Amino acid sequence: MAIHYHTSPNCNLEMSITLESEIKHKSAFFAENGIILEGQAPIYVAPPYYSCEVPVVYEEGQGIRFAIGLYVQTNGGNVYQQADKLFINTPNDVYIYVSGVTDFKQKELFFSKRNCMMENIQHIQYEKQKKAHMDVYANYFDRMHLDINYTPDNELALKMFHYARYLMICSSVPGSQCTNLQGIWNHHMRAPWSSNYTVNINTEMNYWMA
C-alpha cells in the first residue's frame, strides 16, 4: 500500500502513525522511519452467532505468522520515534508505504521474507509503485465497459458497480487467494459468517461482475 499526503504551500503537515492489530502481536521500530508489527493468528475464532466463553483461541507456535512493515519517506522536516508511534512534522509531502508477509506458504522462509520486506520497503518509489498497481488492475478493469442512460441514480449505481469491481480485482491479484465473503477488506476479529469461503453461491457471486 502506498499513501501520498500533499502539503499546501506555506503549510506544515503534522501527524502521528502507528500499527495496531486485534490479534496478539508485538511491534518495534526499524531503520529511522519504520515500524514493524509481528503476530500469529489464532487457531480458532468462533462465529459471531456462537456464544462461548473463549471465542478466540491461540496456541503457541500454531496459526499463521505475519509481519507488517510501515515506512515513511519525507523530503525534509522531522520524523521521530516515541512510544510505539512515528511523529512527523514537515512542510513537504509525505509518503507512507505498508507491506506485509505471512508464512501461509513456505513457513521456513518467513524470517528471510520478513527481512527482505523491511529492506525493500525503504526503497519504494511512489510513482513507480502507483504505475505498477494501475497496470495490474487496469489489465482486468478495462476488459469491459458499462454505459447506462444518465440519471443521478444510475450514476451512483455505475460508480458502485465499478468500485466493487476494483475491490474484487485488488483482492484477487495473481498469486493470492480468491475473495471470501469480505475478502482482504475484512476488519473484524469475528467477521459476519466468519468471512468464510461459502462456495455454494457467495464465492461465485463475487465474480459475476468480472
Segments and roles (model prediction):
Residues 1-210:
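Aromatic-residue-lined binding/catalytic grooves and analogous aromatic/hydrophobic interfacial grooves
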